[in-house]
């Protein structure tokens, strides 16, 4: 729907920030031509607990830096960083070390830096507009593309949830010395999710502190493994800062691509843009907005530095201890250590292949039972923390895209059911190798969903009607465009490699049809993104059918006078 300048928007009331949003129009007009937000009345997210409380920012005279203010803004970045430490990332890390040694640490560093820059865009969108990414997508895209985009993001969230369930189930199985079967661990994760989700009833800061506690557990457990194995520090530094991969072949290249897919999570853009709304920022004051952007970026830098160090711990442990090890060598060590898991590995001369489960077993064989149990505790912390942030992501995405308010209980029931059923079937009817093998497929799935977060975040943060003076400059636009192109190229590589392994004509046909539909939708989003980046000649005077217009009518989001229209 495109409104004439004289046409009035029905006064539906406030549209989305649930708090200090009345001042948004003073600095940030945003537009919509496909649909307008439906009001929820005077209620303030009645089913959501996360935004029931907003953290006040201490008032001080302006200074370049204040530790008090940084502490007040600390929280969202560490919750966001959980996605960089989920079981899928841990599995990617250990496989990277076992397959390529220290050679791919620079890829991990580069992927983390790229992730940081993308999180910066997500946080800025939430701070400047008072809306998270899903809400902005709801206001901008027409109905059909909006629904498709929502389904793609939900698919990414469910895939991530499956990884968390798998990781938690394996950790419980290891901690119980196999007494709790894998399907039992899967069922336990259903119950513990509800327990942990009640924590935010005790206050936002306590919830954020609990996440900090889980990150600390991961740092201590994986740090213990690092100290125990004693990897070569010179090799670690060389792998981190020298971008090369001598002697690398297809497995190493595929692993490098897998690192990118594991580190940069699509749903994390939606999550971070929503989490920053938990701080009280007067968006009518440009100085406060700039200050919030600065402190959120500093916090994100600290949080992702911590997550990077933890990931380096895991890569280095497996690079030092298990790079180029054979199954025969591992079996011999496990038998000498009287490990009950010696039969887990084939007694042949092929290169050792590890996953989350086997990784814990070989650590126990080489460095004692303590290493196995401490590894399992770290994996459990990774799975549980990711479970909670995944639930928040799902809630924000559903509420934003569909303007639908669900209780968190109902939301967990839905997503957990979808994630649990296939995972439970594999756990019951297959072995642990098939269960952990799902992580590789799910990392590919996450990578394929990346454009559905990267393109919208780049589009909207580049639009001046949305971001006012905080829109992306030419440098960010060029860098973002190159990044999206690179990610899409990586995805196509993933698709080609994966399809080649299918080995069946019917599957080739299905893959071809899905690939065409996938690329078509990515092209659609990319087209709109290029117009937003300034290539207005692409709109051909007809882009209003797509959701972007050469002269988009905009309205002041969340203002009391919702009928006021202005034109760019």
UniProtKB/Swiss-Prot annotation:
Residues 1-69, 118-154, 195-208, 277-301, 382-408, 462-482, 528-568 are cytoplasmic. The modification Phosphoserine is found at residues 564, 567. Glycans are attached at residues 336, 349. It is a multi-pass membrane protein. GO terms for molecular function: cadmium ion binding; cadmium ion transmembrane transporter activity; cobalt ion binding; cobalt ion transmembrane transporter activity; copper ion binding; copper ion transmembrane transporter activity; ferrous iron transmembrane transporter activity; inorganic cation transmembrane transporter activity. One of its GO terms (cellular component) is recycling endosome. Changing residue 267 to A: Reduces expression at the plasma membrane. Does not affect H(+)-coupled Fe(2+) transport. Coiled coil: none annotated. Ubiquitinated by WWP2. N-glycosylated. Proton-coupled metal ion symporter operating with a proton to metal ion stoichiometry of 1:1. Selectively transports various divalent metal cations, in decreasing affinity: Cd(2+) > Fe(2+) > Co(2+), Mn(2+) >> Zn(2+), Ni(2+), VO(2+). Essential for maintenance of iron homeostasis by modulating intestinal absorption of dietary Fe(2+) and TF-associated endosomal Fe(2+) transport in erythroid precursors and other cells. Enables Fe(2+) and Mn(2+) ion entry into mitochondria, and is thus expected to promote mitochondrial heme synthesis, iron-sulfur cluster biogenesis and antioxidant defense. Forms a complex with NDFIP1 and NEDD4L, in cortical neurons, in response to iron and cobalt exposure; this interaction leads to SLC11A2 ubiquitination by NEDD4L and proteasome-dependent degradation. Interacts with NDFIP1, NDFIP2 and WWP2; this interaction leads to SLC11A2 ubiquitination by WWP2 and subsequent proteasome-dependent degradation. Interacts with COX2 and TOM6 at the outer mitochondrion membrane. Interacts with ARRDC1; this interaction regulates the incorporation of SLC11A2 into extracellular vesicles through an ubiquitination-dependent mechanism. This is Natural resistance-associated macrophage protein 2.
């Amino acid at each position: 729907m495109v409104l004439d300048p004289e046409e009035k928007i029905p006064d539906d009331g406030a549209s989305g920030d649930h708090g200090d949003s009345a001042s948004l129009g003073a600095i940030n007009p945003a537009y919509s031509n496909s649909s307008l937000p439906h009001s929820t009345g005077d209620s303030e997210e009645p089913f959501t607990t996360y935004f029931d409380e907003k953290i006040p920012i201490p008032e001080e005279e302006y200074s370049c830096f204040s530790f008090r203010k940084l502490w007040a803004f600390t929280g969202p970045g560490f919750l966001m960083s959980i996605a960089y430490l989920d079981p899928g990332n841990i599995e990617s890390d250990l496989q990277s070390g076992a397959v390529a040694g220290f050679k791919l640490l620079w890829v991990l560093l580069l992927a983390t830096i790229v992730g940081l820059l993308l999180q910066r865009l997500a946080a800025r969108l939430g701070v400047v507009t008072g809306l998270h990414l899903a809400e902005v997508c709801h206001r901008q895209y027409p109905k059909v593309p909006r629904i498709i985009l929502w389904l793609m993001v939900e698919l990414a969230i469910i895939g991530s949830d499956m990884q968390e369930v798998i990781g938690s189930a394996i950790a419980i199985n290891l901690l119980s010395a196999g007494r709790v079967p894998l399907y039992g661990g899967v069922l336990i994760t259903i119950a513990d999710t509800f327990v942990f989700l009640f924590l935010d009833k005790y206050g936002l800061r306590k919830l954020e502190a609990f996440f900090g506690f889980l990150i600390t557990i991961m740092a201590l457990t994986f740090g213990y493994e690092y100290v125990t194995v004693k990897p070569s520090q010179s090799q670690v530094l060389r792998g981190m800062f020298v971008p090369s991969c001598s002697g690398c072949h297809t497995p190493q290249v595929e692993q490098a691509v897998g690192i990118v897919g594991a580190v940069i999570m699509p749903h994390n853009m939606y999550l971070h843009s929503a989490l920053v709304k938990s701080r009280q920022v007067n968006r009518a004051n440009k100085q406060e907005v700039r200050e919030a952007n600065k402190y959120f970026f500093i916090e994100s830098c600290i949080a992702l530095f911590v997550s990077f160090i933890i990931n380096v711990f895991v890569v280095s442990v497996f690079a030092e201890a298990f790079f180029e090890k054979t199954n025969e060598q591992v079996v011999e060590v496990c038998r000498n250590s009287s490990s009950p898991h010696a039969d887990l590995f084939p007694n042949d001369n092929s290169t050792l292949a590890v996953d989350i489960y086997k990784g814990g077993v070989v650590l126990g064989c080489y460095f004692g039972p303590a290493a196995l149990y401490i590894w399992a505790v770290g994996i459990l912390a990774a799975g549980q923390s990711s479970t909670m942030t995944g639930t928040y992501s799902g809630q924000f995405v559903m509420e934003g895209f569909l303007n639908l308010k669900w209780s968190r209980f109902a939301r967990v029931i839905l997503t957990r059911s979808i994630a649990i059923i296939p995972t439970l079937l594999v756990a019951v009817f297959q072995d642990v190798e098939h269960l952990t093998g799902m992580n590789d497929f799910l990392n590919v799935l996450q990578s394929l969903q990346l454009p559905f977060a990267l393109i919208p975040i780049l589009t909207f943060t580049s639009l001046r009607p949305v971001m006012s003076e905080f829109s992306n400059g030419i440098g960010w636009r060029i860098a973002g465009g190159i990044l999206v192109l690179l990610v899409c190229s990586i995805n196509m590589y993933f698709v080609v490699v994966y399809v080649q392994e299918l080995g069946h004509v019917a599957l080739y046909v299905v893959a071809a049809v899905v690939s065409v539909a996938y690329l078509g939708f990515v092209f659609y989003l990319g087209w709109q993104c290029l117009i937003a980046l300034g290539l207005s000649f692409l709109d051909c005077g007809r882009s209003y059918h797509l959701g972007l217009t050469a002269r988009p009518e905009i309205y002041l989001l969340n203002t009391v006078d919702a009928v006021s229209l202005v034109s760019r």
